[in-house]
Amino acid sequence: MSRVKTTVVRKAGGQVWEDPTLLEWDPNHFRLFVGNLGNDVNDESLYQAFSEYPSLVKTKVVRDREGKTRGFGFVSFKDSDQFLKAWREKNGKYIGSRPVKLSRATSDVKPNEVNEKTIDSKIRNSLYSRTIHHGNRVQKKIKNKHGKNSSKSSRAAQSAAAELISSSSITGARPANSTSVPNAVNTEISAARATESEASRNQTKASRDYSRASSFRRV
């Protein structure tokens, strides 16, 4: 029998995942997103930066698994007026070594009681999970798609060859198969070049004969 647990389920871009860190925040509070934080800012220094507002509840700098800052954090307030005041007064001001960028944090993401089996199934069936855990299946689909395209190209090439054979038959040429078509074309090209070469030689010979005749006349 599957259990029921309280968590925050997030959805975006075809992906479904759990974000248990959002359980630390009271959904009734007003949260600010604090961006462009430097490596020198931690939870305590972020709290000190907003400590002048009495309704300040919590601050947190988001970090990766290795403990490195991800460059942003969150600040929450009980009072909406102080939330707006802090947003207006602190936006663009330096906290640590950088000027921060403030915006309203997403407030429609709230904790819910969900069935463990159901949420696990949704995560597995999301786009992200299909790409990560079923990569072979995705690659197979891509290969099949490319195979279809190749078959179409092959059929088109065969059709073009048949057309060439048909047109050659109309003009009197009767190639035995598609490979004889290029040979017939090459033969015609070679014959044309030979004719052109012979004409050039005849022209050169005529020029020499004319020059000799002219020299005899002068004598």
Curated annotation (Swiss-Prot):
One term of GO molecular function: mRNA binding
Swiss-Prot/TrEMBL GO biological process terms: mRNA cis splicing, via spliceosome
TM annotation in the entry: none
The organism's place on the tree of life at top rank: Eukaryota
Domain RRM: 30-107
UniProt biased composition (Polar residues): 176-186
Extent of Low complexity compositional bias: 150-169
InterPro entries: Nucleotide-bd_a/b_plait_sf, RBD_domain_sf, RBM42_RBP45_47-like, RBM42_RRM, RRM_dom
Start-end of Basic residues biased regions: 140-149
SUPFAM superfamilies: RNA-binding domain, RBD
Region called Disordered, residue ranges: 140-219
CC terms in the record's Gene Ontology section: nucleus; U4/U6 x U5 tri-snRNP complex
SMART domains the record matches: RRM (SM00360)
Keywords noted in UniProt: RNA-binding
Pfam families: RRM_1
Name this protein carries in UniProt: Uncharacterized RNA-binding protein C22E12.02
Organism: Schizosaccharomyces pombe (strain 972 / ATCC 24843)
Lineage: Eukaryota, Fungi, Dikarya, Ascomycota, Taphrinomycotina
